[in-house]
A protein has these predicted regions:
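Sec-dependent N-terminal signal peptides
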Residues: 1-5
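Active-site mouth of glycoside hydrolases
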Residues: 38-44, 50-260
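Short, solvent-exposed loop/turn elements at domain surfaces
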Residues: 62-71, 260-261, 296-299, 369, ...
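Extracellular glycoside hydrolase catalytic/binding regions
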Residues: 77-78, 82, 86, 103, ...
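C-terminal functional modules
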Residues: 377-401
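Extracellular ligand-binding interfaces
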Residues: 402-483, 489-515, 520-527
């Protein structure tokens, strides 16, 4: 788990305060599209939410961040919000995204570690979630609020797709959604609820139920029945709380949020076929959700995979009476080129939009300390998706890290502690080195740039003796890629430095600004 020393943000009011009803406007375009269908409450139907919500983005690795083995106060919202290396969320970040052309923010939230033994959500956590939701709504965007890593592959995840686990956790799950629904019951139609994220069976199988191990028809049927039971419980509880929740648009996910794509196993389609539309007291206010992460090393194959996904969703899910949102999408390639990423993003957005489906990107366009500035850490990717959605003539406002004059104050607290300079897999076909600039020469022998090679245990060290050090990657030692680059401190006492600039150097000599963050044993503070 990573930590950042970040500026404090007020946590909001107590549970006794009146819930604020944000006075928000429609996202771009500022008025609903012609033909928007409203019910007696004056609320959009689900199909029209898809039309009006625009392009979406996930506030990922933030309120969803968790570690079931971590012993820490569940009410300490700032610790958990930043424990996966992200900055404290600010209103400025949401306004930047709105100004750029985004219309929806999905806010993933993990709840279980923030509940007491009786299933009551800590007031400090609920208030922080409420505050972040209001940041989104006040910026004029739609917001999707969910239950996130309470599901998933972790053995300690408490929401599991089996009827036995459903019966055991039903009261706690419904109690959680009752608390969420009561907190937000007077918020308007720009707020949507999502039932659960990627719920898996007792084997923690991705792709389809019982994929892990020999296929078990009985266990798989039980898992799909449980998914439908959780979905129905969610709808029933939210509607029962009254207020605006009577007509709120609600999202239910397939098993594992699987999208049914692929031909390598006949059971891949099962999560779509077995998904049911919950019964509801109102019509046309439910949506289905799936996720999509194609490998993009072969762009033609990725394009076909997206097209097949859309066909399957229309045939097996939309036909059941509700539209679809791709609640998470991105790519699963280990080290894709920027060219491939842009081509894939453009094609994905164009195909999904043409199919009248919604989409929320996961999540890299603004990442780490870039969110605190705020700025776009991947402006090329952001521009590609925005132009694919709004049209090639659309020119988004995309502030970048290199346009801001700031530095990073680092406090090393343990011997051998490290600051991330750049942590993604780095192809040595595209990059030749890294450069770091400090505000002064370090203490002799105290700092080294540490480069992690392709193979575990293979590392390249270069001692830093002046205020600037450029390191060329040694491919003969490191292999075809670099897994991580850090600035390591050898001192066994607290030691403070200021990083003025860190860049990756491309083969053509151009530089790519990096955002240093804590790896372990140190704090990093952004200084503007």
């Amino acid at each position: 788990i990573f930590s950042l020393l970040l500026s404090m943000v007020a946590c909001g009011s107590s549970n006794d305060d009146v819930v604020k009803v944000p006075d928000t406007e429609q996202p771009d375009p500022d008025t609903p599209q012609t033909g928007t269908d409203y019910d007696d409450l004056g609320w959009e139907h689900a199909e029209d939410v898809i039309k009006n919500m625009g392009l979406g983005w996930n506030l990922g690795n933030t309120l969803d961040a968790c570690d079931y083995n971590q012993i820490h106060d569940g009410g300490d919202w700032m610790f958990w919000e930043t424990c996966w290396g992200q900055s404290v969320t600010t209103p400025e970040l949401m306004h930047m995204l709105k100004q750029a052309g985004y219309g929806t923010i999905r806010v993933p939230v993990t709840w279980g570690i923030h509940m007491d033994a009786n299933g009551v959500v800590y007031s400090s956590w609920m208030n922080r979630v409420k505050q972040v939701v209001e940041y989104v709504l006040d910026a004029g965007m739609y917001c999707i609020l969910n239950v996130h890593h309470d599901t998933g592959a972790d053995e300690k995840a408490w929401l599991v797709a089996s009827m036995k686990e459903y019966e055991a956790q039903k009261a706690r799950y419904e109690g959680l959604w009752k608390q969420i629904a009561e907190t937000f019951k007077e918020y308007d139609h720009h707020l949507l609820f999502e039932s659960y994220n990627e719920m898996l069976d007792e084997r923690r199988s991705w792709c389809f139920s019982t994929f892990n191990g020999e296929y078990d028809e009985e266990m798989a049927a039980d898992a799909y029945a449980a998914i439908n039971s959780y979905a129905q419980s969610f709808v029933n509880v939210v509607r029962s709380t009254g207020g605006n929740n009577v007509g709120r648009n609600l999202i239910v996910n397939t098993y594992g949020a699987c999208n049914g794509t692929g031909t390598w196993n006949k059971h891949l389609i099962d999560p779509l076929v077995m998904m049911e539309l919950p019964e509801d007291v109102v019509e046309n206010h439910l949506l289905f959700e799936v996720h999509s992460y194609p490998n993009i090393d072969n762009l033609n194959a990725a394009r076909s995979e997206v097209a097949d996904m859309i066909l399957n969703l229309k045939k097996h899910v939309v036909a059941k009476g509700a539209p679809v949102i791709i609640g998470e999408w991105g790519n699963s390639s280990e080290n894709p080129s920027l060219e491939n990423k842009i081509a894939f993003i453009t094609d994905f957005v164009e195909q999904v939009k043409a199919a009248d489906m919604g989409m929320c990107y996961w999540m890299g366009i603004t990442n780490g300390i870039a969110r605190q500035v705020p700025a776009f850490s991947e402006p090329e990717c952001a521009k590609a998706m925005l132009q694919a959605f709004h049209g090639t003539d659309f020119q988004p406002e995309l502030p970048t890290m290199d346009a801001v004059n700031f530095s990073y104050a680092v406090t090393y607290q343990q011997q051998w502690s490290e600051v991330h300079l750049c942590s993604e897999n780095i192809s040595l076909d595209e990059y030749k080195g890294v450069k770091v600039e400090l505000d002064g020469a370090p203490e002799n022998g105290s700092l080294s740039i540490k480069v992690y090679g392709e193979t575990e245990g293979v590392e390249q060290y270069t001692s830093m003796t002046s205020d600037c050090l450029e390191v060329t990657f040694d491919s003969s030692k490191l292999g075809n890629k670099v897994r991580r680059v850090t600035l390591q401190c050898s001192l066994d006492t607290e030691y403070c430095i200021t990083i003025k600039r860190a860049v990756l150097i491309r083969k053509d000599g151009t530089e790519e600004i990096q955002c240093p963050t804590s790896f372990w044993g140190c704090d990093v503070l952004l200084q503007k």
